[in-house]
A protein has these predicted regions:
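Conserved acidic residues
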Residues: 18, 52, 176
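Active-site/ligand-binding-proximal alpha/beta "capping" segment
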Residues: 1-43, 140-146
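A generic structural signal for well-ordered alpha-helical surface patches
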Residues: 6, 137, 141-144, 158-165
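Active-site/ligand-binding loops adjacent to catalytic centers
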Residues: 39-155
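Catalytic phosphate/nucleotide-handling subdomain of diverse soluble enzymes
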Residues: 162-176
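Short glycine/serine/threonine-rich phosphate/pyrophosphate-binding segments
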Residues: 26-33, 63, 157-164
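Helix N-cap/coil-helix junction residues
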Residues: 14, 45, 151, 172-173
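Buried hydrophobic positions in well-ordered alpha/beta secondary-structure cores of metabolic enzymes
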Residues: 6-8, 21, 52, 124, ...
Length: 176
């Protein structure tokens, strides 16, 4: 998974984009991208660290809930490795007690307890990243955008154009 950003940046002659956007499920791609960016920056191969945006499905948005303080009004952060493990445990307990299960048609990101949550937090901290959620309808619209260009993608990948659209509309990602 670390190869994806590596090869992309190599293709771009090590000129980094402002943003790298991933759908958020288990957060393996997010954490691998963060690790790749750390290494490339340490080696001096890239001069600027792009920001990572993680796009959760609204029905499977554990990272969005925890990262953006939607549970107990506390924003979960990597905090140089001193993340609040008790906050994660309390949220997972609430999920279990309340019968909260991930629900989205985007099955590739239909994950309630991301296995790479902590590593994802590290990547977000390192890149000054952000997390948002999009609806299933927005992901379907994102798939349509990809389709208009002659490509096909599954629903979770449709989260990326949907998230970019939302971030552009919110003026978080700037139009160039």
């Amino acid at each position: 998974q670390k190869t994806i950003p590596y090869r992309t940046l190599e293709y771009l002659d090590w000129k980094t984009p402002d943003w790298i956007v991933y759908p958020g499920g288990a957060l393996g791609n997010t954490s691998s991208c963060g690790k790749c960016l750390m290494e490339l920056y340490q080696w001096g191969w890239i001069k600027k660290i792009p920001r990572i945006a993680v796009i959760n499905a609204e029905g499977a948005n554990t990272l969005d809930v925890l990262y953006n303080g939607k549970f107990e009004d506390t924003e979960l952060r990597w905090n140089n490795g001193n993340f609040d493990v008790e906050l994660i445990e309390r949220y997972y307990t609430k999920m279990n007690d309340d019968g909260i299960r991930p629900k989205t048609k985007a099955t590739a990101i239909q994950i309630g307890k991301p296995s790479n949550l902590v590593k994802g937090l590290r990547a977000l901290e390192y890149t000054n990243g952000i997390v948002i959620s999009v609806t299933d309808k927005e992901m379907l619209d994102g798939m349509s955008v990809v389709g208009l260009n002659g490509f096909d993608c599954e629903m979770a990948s449709g989260a990326v154009p949907a998230g970019i659209k939302k971030l552009l509309n919110d003026n978080i990602i700037k139009k160039d």
